[in-house]
Amino acid sequence: MSSIQSIQSRIKTVQSIRKITHAMELVSYSKLKKAKTAFDEVEKYNLLIDQTFNKIFENISHDDLKELMKSRNNSKSKLYIIVTSNLGLAGAYNANVIKLVKETVTSDDYLIIIGSYGVRALRQQYNEQIINLSDITTSKRTSTLVSKIIKRAFKYYRNGAVSSINFIYTKFINNLVQEELCEKVFPFDEQMIREHIDRKEIDYKLEFEPSAKDVLADAIPLFVDSKLHLAMATSLISEHSARRSAMENATRNSDSLITELDMEFKRKRQAKITNEIIEIVSGADAV
């Protein structure tokens, strides 16, 4: 059985760990609030992009739309842009994304990995398939990072190296639920186009020069760019939410362990005192 001194040492260790996990919980909560504010701004931007594309879809013929949207090659390869975090200690956030990657990606596919955690987890297995590696950057540099990634993705698509561009990321549902997704973003499928055309939220008229088809052809990378911004924003919320929950659980477990150790310490101390009293009484009786 543990000695009183070792129990005291364990209590101090757990108390120190609790201070760290509680501090990380508070930091994650603060970052979560900021991430939600940033997501709201990105979502507004995406809504504007969606509305503009809805109007373009309304002003382009079905044949022209199919011509623009159809895959330009017969490549068996797909491109996956994977969003993870730079840091760990976020529960199953990164592990779930990595698991989905391994279930989805084949040996013919190509990867662009965002987040150093994903780089570390996937580099060895998919080294020959990775075409770009990036850390998560500050918000001021995110636009530059996204722009470079989308340009590279479309270069592979236009060269016929891949037949589609896909995202693997984590969608924020609520503070307790985050869902990892694999989402095809280009070429658009007919169902997505139909959903856009059926929306009627725009009540103003747009004119296109030289034509809606030409505008759409040039604007497609901008659309995919906006979707990657959104995927990264919702992934960031998911990361901070998962880390806050993980640290909250760790703090709660520390409290429980401290309570158990404290009770064990008191039992040990009481037993020691009782034994000392018995020894004193026994010694007195012997005299």
From Swiss-Prot:
GO terms for biological process: proton motive force-driven plasma membrane ATP synthesis. GO terms for molecular function: ATP binding; proton-transporting ATP synthase activity, rotational mechanism. Pfam families: ATP-synt. SUPFAM superfamilies: ATP synthase (F1-ATPase), gamma subunit (SSF52943). It is found in: Cell membrane. Gene3D superfamilies: 3.40.1380.10, ATP synthase, gamma subunit, helix hairpin domain (1.10.287.80). Its main location: membrane. It comes from the Bacteria. Keywords: ATP synthesis, Cell membrane, CF(1), Hydrogen ion transport, Ion transport, Membrane, Transport. One of its GO terms (cellular component) is plasma membrane. It is a peripheral membrane protein. PANTHER family: ATP SYNTHASE GAMMA CHAIN, ATP SYNTHASE SUBUNIT GAMMA, MITOCHONDRIAL. Belongs to the ATPase gamma chain family. Produces ATP from ADP in the presence of a proton gradient across the membrane. The gamma chain is believed to be important in regulating ATPase activity and the flow of protons through the CF(0) complex. F-type ATPases have 2 components, CF(1) - the catalytic core - and CF(0) - the membrane proton channel. CF(1) has five subunits: alpha(3), beta(3), gamma(1), delta(1), epsilon(1). CF(0) has three main subunits: a, b and c. This is ATP synthase gamma chain. It comes from Mycoplasmopsis agalactiae (strain NCTC 10123 / CIP 59.7 / PG2) (Mycoplasma agalactiae).
